[in-house]
């Protein structure tokens, strides 16, 4: 309904609640679990932070918000079909899910319904960590070592230099 009534909104999603057997382990505060989470590039606790964010206004502001929050749950939104088609990444790389969201934001605003209408399972293959996921995808060791380079290069080319340099400390 939001997409029908607001032509500037290109995607809409509700807040998301996580569930699953791994949630308890990720939420633990013991030293071993903290080390394990860091090794898997898991720096936050899913139940403590919002996973989707409304983004309205100028592209630079929206891009900065999503870069800083570094969440890809927004991919589960309902999108305008022509916009999501234009926003897809042809050759995926680590963080290409975030790149898709950044592409979508170029075309308009991202609406979030302020209630939980969706639950997301926190498990499956990607819960083993980013390095294991990249190995599963037959990523070379060099690409794993420099896993952020393709995304950084993509941002330099696609965000525009002003937005890229403004957020340079994030990279």
Language-model segments: what does each one mean?
Residues 30, 60-70, 142-146, 162-168:
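Short secondary-structure transition/capping segments
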Residues 44, 116-164:
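Catalytic core of nucleotide-sugar-dependent glycosyltransferases
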Residues 99-104, 165-171:
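C-terminal/domain-terminus segments
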Residues 37-133:
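Conserved nucleotide-sugar donor-binding catalytic segment
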């Amino acid at each position: 309904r939001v997409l029908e009534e607001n032509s500037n909104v290109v995607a809409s999603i509700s807040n998301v609640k996580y569930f699953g057997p791994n949630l308890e382990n990720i939420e633990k505060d013991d030293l071993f679990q903290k080390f394990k989470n860091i090794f898997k590039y898991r720096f936050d606790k899913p139940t403590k932070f919002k996973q989707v964010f409304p983004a309205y206004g100028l592209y630079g502001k929206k891009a900065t918000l999503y870069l800083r929050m570094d969440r890809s749950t927004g991919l589960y939104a309902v999108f305008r079909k022509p916009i999501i088609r234009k926003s897809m990444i042809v050759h995926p790389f680590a963080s290409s899910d975030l790149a898709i969201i950044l592409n979508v934001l170029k075309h308009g605003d991202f609406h979030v319904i302020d209630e939980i209408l969706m639950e997301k399972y926190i498990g499956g293959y990607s819960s083993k960590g980013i390095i294991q996921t990249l190995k599963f995808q037959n990523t070379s060791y060099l690409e794993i070592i420099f896993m952020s380079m393709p995304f950084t290069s993509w941002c330099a080319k696609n965000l525009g230099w002003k937005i890229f340099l403004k957020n340079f400390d994030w990279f």
